Amino acid sequence: QEDEEMEEIEMSSRYIQTDDSIVANSNFLKNNFEMEPVNFIIKNGILVSIRDNELDSFNETFKKVFVNTRNFPTGYHVLVALFETRVEKDADLIEDTTDMITLLSQQINAESDHVDEDLLVQIKDLQEKVTIIRQNIMDKQRVISNILKCDFFPEELYPRLTMIIKDINSLFDYTRFGFDRLDYLQDTFLGLVNIEQNKIIKIFTVINIIFLPPTLIGSLYGMNFDFMPELHWQYGYLWALGLMVFSVVLILLIFKLKKWL
């Protein structure tokens, strides 16, 4: 019940501002790409955060606060530091995802002769991860853009907020590049599947063509009409077999000359 209520609050509004307070709702990604909704309430320089689980972004930020408390005189400073840390984490996730895309690309190139359905599953999984990261950083961009419009937020923190926005825009470019690479890999995979299917169809087509003349010859001599001298010929059976073999060899030679095989 509490999870549903928090999700409803989080979805209803990312940012609410009154005369002296800010309520910001944002999703923080875990290492397993699950989203953790976090609610921030800041009033008179005091920051309160509401979340269900521990997050690395908070732990790292708290360490920075304890090491040098002078750099964090108010909750506004802590809030900005939290978003800075979170964006850095998002950048690390994008870098890890990019490495996975590179490995997948190498795997597809190495297995170009035999494609596996598991590769397509991996592509879809990476597409989902990139989508989640993009949604996450878009969420941060929306909240920080609203904070920049706040008239009582400390002006000294505006440059840092602006820098976060620039970093987020850079991450958008990386996610777009990731989408492009994954689309290319998906097209490559489907192309390899088509090539493999065409090879199979080609093999069956060649087999059908090769055995078509022998089948025709066998069918002709299987008619058993009265006026078929070969049926009563001593070497008729060998003649039919030889004719079948000759037709197969002839077709194979034609295919070789035409470079169809």
Regions found by a protein language model. Give the residues of each.
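Proline-rich low-complexity regions
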Residues: 12-14, 92, 138-139, 229
